[in-house]
């Protein structure tokens, strides 16, 4: 994209097609903290794509990297007494779980379909489990594992959505029903957002490939209209009579871009970041570019708090960030404690294993020395 071209032209074309504005009922009450997540896809110069996301929570979700092999039999457990949808994974998947469950909150399959679960508190409206058959029902936290395990493209996922319902049930480790929505991207660059609304799964094509949290995706797209003046180019000096007013330093074209950690602000900022970033070849160059962008959305402990106190519990922070190279099938992760990016490739794993595999993420608390010991 040319430097002189405002990065908002993409979003404006989308809005011109008629993106509807969804107004949320005023009586809607948020019962959980609005945990932050930010996701995006970067195109490369050679037709590849890299997906990146952060995972924020106010309490430890005990995530581990796992590999779910081909033919692994999975069941979405609706309650202790009720089994939901059962399926056998068609494709192997690598990703991050939570609470030691064999379920993915983020991941990529061997065909390059990648995506994640992002928090959507106060807006998710799931299907009532009493109104649908259990054998067609998925919990909110099992939907991504089902999608990545069974499909290779976002078109296939869209076609299969009518066969399942995502039902509102309590997640035992959390103690409440987590409100979430989903982002999915395939190796061709196609992207969709799936949101549970009015008991149904609403699908949006995602021309920008970005997603954060509440409110709904179409609201975020409409909100971009407030920022159509932003561009990566510095503004020209302003001449007033005999005076020339120069911008104060670099970045004047982005003056006014929101810098806080709220979902609407992060949506605007990550859109600006990916659409103005210069494309590079796929592989490690694109991965490093994605890492630089992710660093701009890293939330340290203490920046986001529900109340003024010295207790870490409830302070939203970036527990981990992931990058999926969808062309080369490499999945990377770095954690709050371990900032070195670690990668796993499908070719290094037994994709036909009988059990799902937990992959240990090395921990290096100290910085690595510049001069290596002989």
PLM region descriptions:
Residues 36-135, 168, 373-374:
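A contiguous strand-loop segment
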Residues 13-25:
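Sec-dependent N-terminal signal peptides
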Residues 36-50, 58, 169-170, 177-178, ...:
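C-terminus-biased signal that marks the final domain/tail of proteins
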Residues 110-111, 148-156, 283-287, 326-328:
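A short, structured loop/turn motif at beta-sheet edges
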Residues 154, 158-196:
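Aromatic- and glycine-enriched pocket-lining scaffold segments that form the walls
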Residues 128-164:
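Compact, glycine/acidic-enriched structural inserts
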Residues 30-36:
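Sec/Tat signal peptide C-region and signal peptidase I cleavage site
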Residues 1-14:
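N-terminal secretory signal peptides that target proteins for export/translocation
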């Amino acid at each position: 994209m040319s430097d002189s071209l405002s990065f908002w032209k993409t979003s404006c074309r989308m809005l011109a097609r008629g993106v509807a504005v969804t107004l949320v009922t005023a009586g809607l009450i948020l019962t959980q903290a609005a945990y932050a997540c930010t996701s995006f896809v970067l195109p490369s110069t050679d037709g590849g794509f890299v997906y990146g996301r952060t995972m924020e929570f106010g309490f430890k979700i005990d995530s581990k990297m796992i590999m779910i092999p081909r033919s692994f039999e999975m069941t979405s457990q609706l309650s202790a007494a009720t089994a939901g949808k059962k399926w056998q994974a068609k494709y192997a998947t690598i990703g991050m779980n939570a609470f030691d469950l064999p379920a993915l909150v983020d991941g990529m399959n061997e065909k390059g379909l990648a995506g994640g679960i992002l928090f959507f508190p106060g807006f998710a409206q799931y299907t009532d489990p009493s109104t649908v058959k259990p054998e067609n029902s998925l919990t909110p936290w099992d939907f991504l594992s089902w999608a990545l395990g069974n499909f290779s493209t976002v078109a296939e996922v869209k076609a299969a959505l009518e066969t399942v319902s995502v039902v509102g049930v309590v997640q035992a480790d959390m103690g409440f029903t987590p409100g979430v929505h989903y982002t999915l991207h395939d190796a061709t660059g196609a992207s969709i957002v799936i949101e549970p609304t009015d008991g149904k799964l609403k699908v949006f094509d995602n021309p920008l490939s970005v997603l954060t949290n509440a409110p709904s995706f179409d609201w975020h797209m409409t909100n971009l209209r407030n920022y159509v003046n932003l561009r990566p180019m510095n503004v020209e000096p302003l001449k007033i009579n005999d005076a020339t007013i120069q911008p104060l330093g670099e970045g004047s074209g982005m003056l006014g871009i929101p810098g806080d950690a709220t979902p609407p602000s992060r949506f605007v900022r990550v859109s600006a970041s990916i659409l103005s970033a210069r494309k590079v070849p796929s592989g490690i160059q694109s991965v490093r570019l994605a890492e630089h962008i992710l660093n701009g959305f890293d939330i340290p402990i203490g920046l986001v708090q529900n109340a003024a106190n010295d207790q870490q519990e409830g302070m939203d922070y970036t527990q981990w960030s992931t990058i999926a190279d969808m062309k080369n099938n490499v999945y990377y992760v770095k954690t709050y404690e371990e900032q070195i990016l670690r990668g796993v490739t499908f070719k290094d794993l037994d994709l036909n294993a009988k059990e799902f595999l937990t992959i240990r993420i090395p921990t290096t608390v100290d910085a690595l020395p510049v001069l290596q010991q002989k």
